[in-house]
């Protein structure tokens, strides 16, 4: 939420998109329109883009909501129903973004996508660096494993004020007998071990997201898919 310029943006269109938008509305001082000014997508997996369906004619019947997507993600939405209907009916307006190219949303707010390794059956997978006038955030809701990324997550945490990171699975026990190579994510217990090298100030930056089990574990900081914050 950038109240200085009356703008609201959402990162991820989850199945709970209506709740996400209502939550953003609570922080908006001037812009009381429930619909956001734009939605940033990371990839084409169910929990990250399926909320777009609620912008269609059977639901909100939105008008040209700006949806920011990477090239493969954009093409996927344009060429596969029911998502293509959102484009045809002008419920959404797709804006193609590119890796490492910043999008200036307001004079106070900038988002920069970057590629991360993940199951890319239908689209690329990206995270975002989000920069306000005073603080920055790292947003990586899904990634295969931290050591498969060409950057050090520990070093990237040090560069920002907040780090919203993948915590889909707490440990292997959570997925029983399923092959983790088919649904790869960094286990929370692996992340905690890796982040031990960070000092207490750096560790406090980490907020685990895309989580079920951790959400109810009071000893670990956690949040939901999308985060809500004032531009600062």
Task: For each feature predicted by the language model, list its residue ranges.
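Short, conserved loop/helix-junction motifs that constitute active-site signature segments
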Residues: 31-34, 57-63, 86-88, 154-159, ...
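A short, active-site helix/loop in glycosyltransferases that binds the activated sugar's phosphate group
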Residues: 72-82
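Core dinuclear metal-dependent hydrolase active-site scaffold
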Residues: 1-26, 30, 94-156
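Cap/insert and terminal regions of metallo-dependent hydrolase folds
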Residues: 136, 144-228
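Short, electropositive alpha-helical surface patch
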Residues: 19, 26-29, 100-101, 215-232
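Structural beta-sheet core signal
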Residues: 67-69, 138-139, 208
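Active-site metal-binding motif and surrounding structural segment of the metallo-beta-lactamase
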Residues: 6-68, 161
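Short, well-ordered alpha-helix to beta-strand connector turns
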Residues: 36, 89-91, 160-161, 167
